[in-house]
């Protein structure tokens, strides 16, 4: 995970997931989690990106 992807993920978690994994279920789930609260979306975004 590069420096700019980390910065983008911190600022806008769904965008970080979109850039890392593309448009799919992980992106949709991250949007929902971010709408429920910033912290759950942020945790999910980092989890999705470091899963590989």
UniProtKB/Swiss-Prot annotation:
Q: Does the record bear Cell membrane in its keywords?
A: yes
Predominant place of localization: membrane
Keyword field: Cell membrane, Membrane, Transmembrane, Transmembrane helix
Top-level taxon of the source organism: Bacteria
- A GO biological-process term: response to antibiotic
State the similarity comment: Belongs to the UPF0057 (PMP3) family.
- The identity of this protein, by name, is UPF0057 membrane protein YqaE
